[in-house]
A protein has these predicted regions:
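Short, intrinsically disordered, mixed-charge
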Residues: 19-26, 70, 74-82, 181, ...
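Acidic, proline/glycine-enriched N-terminal capping motif
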Residues: 1-46, 54-55
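Glycine-rich, small/acidic residue-mixed loop/short-helix segments
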Residues: 155-162, 177-249
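Short amphipathic beta-strand starts and helix->beta connectors
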Residues: 35-47, 101-105, 176, 208-212
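Residue-level signal for inorganic ion chemistry
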Residues: 10, 62, 172, 209
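A mid-sequence, solvent-exposed acidic-amphipathic segment
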Residues: 130-186, 191
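Short glycine-/aliphatic-rich beta-strand segments at the starts of folded cytosolic domains
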Residues: 1-20, 86-99, 184-194
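Acidic, low-complexity central loop/insert segments
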Residues: 2-7, 49-140, 238
Length: 249
């Protein structure tokens, strides 16, 4: 899991990010914030963890999957116009773990079970099985569960503290709010039980032979899947494996 730690700094940083991301920058005073940036149509572009940068200049660290860092920099640069905002690679690396948190570590804002994160000169983790943790707690990951066609509410962002419905406008807010208040989600992330062996990406077939979704991250006999919930009411097949819905995300 390669991560890039960007720095966003300048006198307009907080207001600039507030108008773009799905969460409320005011929460940064209490600790790290999980958020995403969306297209105007409400679809996923990138998700990240924000924290206050060391020092007193009001800068913000943006912890993002390295595969999305160039896109995120490009998108932030496009929106900044005349704002006093500078965007750069901090050069910091991510360390993470589940045990006692070392000095300078911060809690993962998505779920307490994900432990701590610390930024410094070296990358690494404490050997915890983060795939199993992600699957157990239905935490989607870029390039696996999350992609350009994803809607964040289908991917569990409300449960993972990644969206605030009381803040002001941000890019993609109208679509996200409509999904929250006017529609029942018919598709989305789910935790499933797996009996047999199936590879990530396998299409799920319901009892009537219809496509019910797709398998994603697999850890032992548990997996994450993107499902059509109306077709996930009974056993499904993923190749030769049997799949059963356990919990909607």
């Amino acid at each position: 899991m390669a991560r890039t730690i960007l720095t966003v700094s300048g006198s307009d940083t907080i207001g600039f990010l507030q108008g773009l991301i799905t969460n409320d920058m005011a929460k940064l005073a209490q600790g790290p914030v999980y958020a995403a940036i969306l297209t105007p149509q409400g679809k996923y572009l990138a998700d990240f963890i924000l924290s206050a940068a060391p020092g007193a200049d009001g800068g913000v660290l943006v912890d993002v999957d390295s595969s999305l860092a160039p896109l995120l920099v490009q998108r932030l640069s496009m929106y900044k116009l005349r704002a006093d905002v500078q965007i750069a690679d901090s050069g910091l690396q991510l360390q993470r773990g589940k045990g006692p948190a070392p000095q300078g570590a911060l809690p993962d804002p998505r779920h307490p079970a994900l432990g701590w994160r610390r930024y410094g000169p070296e990358a690494g983790d404490d050997g915890s099985d983060f795939l199993a943790l992600r699957v157990a707690h239905m935490v989607p990951e870029t390039g696996i569960e999350l992609g350009p066609d994803s809607y964040i509410l289908e991917m569990g962002f409300e449960r993972l503290n990644g969206v605030d419905f009381r803040k002001g406008c941000y890019v993609g807010q109208e679509v996200t709010a409509r999904m929250k208040h006017k529609t029942e989600l018919k598709k989305g992330l789910a935790l499933v039980a797996l009996e047999g062996t199936a590879q990530p990406g396998t299409v799920l077939i319901d009892e009537n032979g219809k496509e019910a979704g797709q398998l994603h991250s697999v850890s032992g006999n548990r997996a994450l899947a993107y499902l059509r919930f109306d077709r996930a009411t009974g056993p499904m097949q993923a190749g030769s494996a049997t799949v059963q819905l356990l919990e909607r995300g």
